[in-house]
Amino acid sequence: MSVANIHPTAIVAEGAAIAASATIGPYATVGAQVVLGEGVQVGAHAVLDGITHLAEGVQILPFASVGLPPQDLKYKGEPTRVEIGPRTIVREHATVHRGSVGGEGLTRIGADCLIMCVAHVGHDCVLEDRVILANNVMLGGHVYIGDTVFVGGGTAVHQSVRIGRQAVIGGMSGVERDVIPFGSCMGNRARLIGLNLLGLKRRGFGREAINALRAAYRGLFLGRGTFDARVALVAQDHGNQPQVAEILAFIEASSRRGLMRAGRQTHESEAEAA
């Protein structure tokens, strides 16, 4: 560890493993079980504690806290963890709590994520790569978010909710149920309003894939009959298309919160995207 990269006012506990190229700013606090990879930047007054591993290039900005105990009254100091993947940025005043014994004991954030100011990642959450949480987003414990999801500012996500990859959540939403991959939802309480069509186009999904997803969405959420019957029909008609198969697998997977269904804005959203 290079003393030149650590501000003299920072408090670094004996035992912390800090790469030579990592930097620690003024008045930051780094606990004894923290591991900082190459190029990690820790801003002024940030707090890193517990068994916390930051991969190369992670940035922790001023006053953020990572690895503090979970907000779980059952937690009694067990050795749970936080892992943050390469190049992820945790902005000012954001909080990332370590796992609990009621979960897997791990809070994990993937690579190239952006956790904006004052966002909260609760215990045992899993965020895959390229997830963006805008300002003041609140994730309850045990939330799962797939890759390349955007969550708008001020949104609250209930504990144990799953959000499938490439979904988009509108700002100021209250998300109580699982959101399908590629879905778009908003509102208090949030309801599906269609697909994340803009995101799909920006990320290079072709016309064939988008058309199949739109047909599947209409069949699942705007069709007639029971939901199970609609799932079976979509599987029959479009189940060979990879993204549709992903949605069907998401629906069939175990869920503690249940699946979010479409709201009244769906018809308008789909019409505008046509």
Q: What kind of region is each of these model predictions?
A:
Residues 4-191:
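Structural signal for interior beta-strand "rungs" in well-ordered beta-sheet cores
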Residues 1-9, 14-15, 20-21, 57, ...:
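Terminal amphipathic alpha-helical/low-complexity segments used for targeting or macromolecular assembly
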